[in-house]
């Protein structure tokens, strides 16, 4: 008899958080930023939880320490990053898998266009993306881990600290 509640708990943990959160925001909207505005790629500390004490002088992005920043000025580089993200999202749609509920986003893309700032927080561990526009969560989607190598290659070319 105890197996039934255990089974229900396991199903809830495995499948309860596997769907897409909020309204999906396609990376095609990122294409608007290929030739204008700011486009910034971040590596964030996914190991420190937002509730933990923050060391003095730490720069944060949505509660997580920024480990590295790379401003992407080239339209070609922006397109390469966007296409990698689009491919990851297409992979996730073709091969849906239950995602885990970790959301420790170690990568982010910020676009700033006029008075609109949009952040895409990306966790390649649980394959989830959360989208924030002007400080409010506006959507989310899923991805595969495939874009991570492209993102990391751009970050390796950037400033080692920020």
Model-identified regions with their sequence ranges:
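Bacterial N-terminal signal peptides
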Residues: 5-14
């Amino acid at each position: 008899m105890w197996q039934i509640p255990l089974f229900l708990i396991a199903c809830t943990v495995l499948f309860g958080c596997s769907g897409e959160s909020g309204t999906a925001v396609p990376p095609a909207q990122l294409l608007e930023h290929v030739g204008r505005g700011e486009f910034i790629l971040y590596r964030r500390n996914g190991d420190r939880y937002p509730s933990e004490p923050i060391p003095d002088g730490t720069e944060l992005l949505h509660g997580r320490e920024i480990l590295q920043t790379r401003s992407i000025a080239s339209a070609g580089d922006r397109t390469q990053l966007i296409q990698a993200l689009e491919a990851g999202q297409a992979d996730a749609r073709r091969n849906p898998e239950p995602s885990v509920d970790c959301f420790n986003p170690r990568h982010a893309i910020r676009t700033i266009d006029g008075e609109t700032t949009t952040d895409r927080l990306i966790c390649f561990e649980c394959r989830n993306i959360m989208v924030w526009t002007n400080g409010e969560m506006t959507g989310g989607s899923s991805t595969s881990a495939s874009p991570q190598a492209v993102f990391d290659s751009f970050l390796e070319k950037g400033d080692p600290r920020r």
